[in-house]
A protein has these predicted regions:
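Acidic active-site catalytic centers that drive phospho-/nucleotidyl reactions
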Residues: 5, 43, 102
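Short, well-structured N-terminal submotif of metal-dependent ribonuclease cores
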Residues: 1-40, 50-67, 96
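Acidic-residue sensor for enzyme active/binding pockets
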Residues: 11, 43, 111
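Active-site neighborhoods of divalent-metal-dependent phosphate/nucleic-acid chemistry enzymes
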Residues: 46-51, 60, 64, 72-117
Length: 118
């Protein structure tokens, strides 16, 4: 089973060369085996809000994509951060501190026995 990093979800929306590879991979994996972290929802929404400040039309399209595709698709497959994940995250920061969000996503994958897809 897999934990999809935020960039994988974003790539599907963007299109381009990376999208073809992502779509090909997605078509081979059962949807029930793909999960996201609640942090991915945070990162996507922050990105959309930033786009909306610069270009309201583009931001509105991204918001529709997020609300009608991402949220419903992963409604039952979004993993929250709990105490075990928080503690694993702390362990990943020592001796070399890293980004909190990335480390929480990695800790989520480790605690759930999932492979991270980036």
């Amino acid at each position: 089973m897999y934990l999809l990093d935020t960039n994988v979800i974003s790539e599907l929306r963007k299109g381009g060369d990376g999208q073809a590879a992502a779509v090909a991979w997605f078509s081979k994996v059962d949807a029930g085996e793909m999960f996201i972290s609640a942090l991915t929802l945070i990162e996507l929404e922050i990105g959309i809000l930033r786009v909306q400040q610069r270009d309201s039309d583009h931001g509105a399209r991204q918001c529709i994509w997020f609300e009608t595709q991402v949220c419903p698709e992963f409604e039952d497959r979004t993993l929250s951060v709990d105490a075990a994940i928080a503690r694993r995250c702390a362990q990943l920061h020592v001796p070399d501190p890293k980004s909190d969000r990335d480390t929480l996503i990695a800790a989520t994958a480790l605690e759930h026995g999932l492979n991270i897809v980036t």
